[in-house]
């Protein structure tokens, strides 16, 4: 039976929405044993399904916690969840808590895969065709070219898990020419070209991310996070503009009614809650970061992501890819 720990106190809407999403998932996935890691009051008047295990501690991390503090507070719900993974009592961890704190706990408590310098936060980004994987999306601000190579290796394995065959790779840069960017990007370009051959398409710009030109976009966490947040902001603005325009007159309103299925499909494609969570890849276990503002639906989907990561043996595939790269 697959075993997943969930941090009930991580996220803007903890614990109510986290617990509701977890219980809903447990009821629909009886082949998964869910470890609910929370404080005693989280479980008051709650009837747990038979495949849920209550894990009680007495501390939790605020959303503005520093990563260094996160690894010192060993009784926090996030730390205890990761400790369960370290001790092999669970196969995966899910948390909607602070990103930096979860990265620190994943790295130093769960532990890095041997050979991985920096675990990466890899995020599916919607494109006009389907999606691409962005690695890194904010976990690693200052990186070396060798880190970008490992992000590419891990991003490729994640893209394969999501159904991409022989994923193509692009390096996020300020232009498509080979000589663009800082020395870091120039060196990374040559390393990626040597390692992946034709699988590496070359440099891609920010406006290429949603165009579906590549399956994996490699970036440092600083620029990757800016690109991701810019896309999220643009999608939100477009949605709000459409809502505003259709209310201006009766003709627009009638047209909107006819276009309702199209708008619904578009909203679903752009909704980050659809993916629920994404992986910290490169650690000895499956660790899923759910969005900080996750509701019960997003938590349900984050647990689905974790289950798939366990079923597909993602950490093992990362190890195999690293060995192949070293040959």
UniProtKB/Swiss-Prot annotation:
Location comes to: Cytoplasm
Report which superkingdom the organism of origin falls in.
Answer: Bacteria
Q: What is any one of the record's Gene Ontology cellular component terms?
A: cytoplasm
List, in alphabetical order, the Gene Ontology terms for molecular function in this entry. phosphate:acyl-[acyl carrier protein] acyltransferase activity
Enzyme nomenclature, EC number: 2.3.1.274
Q: Name one GO biological process term.
A: fatty acid biosynthetic process
Matching entries from InterPro entries are given as: FA_synthesis (IPR003664), Phospholipid_synth_PlsX-like (IPR012281)
Q: Which HAMAP family match?
A: PlsX (MF_00019)
**Could you describe the subunit structure of this protein?**
Homodimer. Probably interacts with PlsY.
- What name goes with this protein? Phosphate acyltransferase
Gene name in the database record: plsX
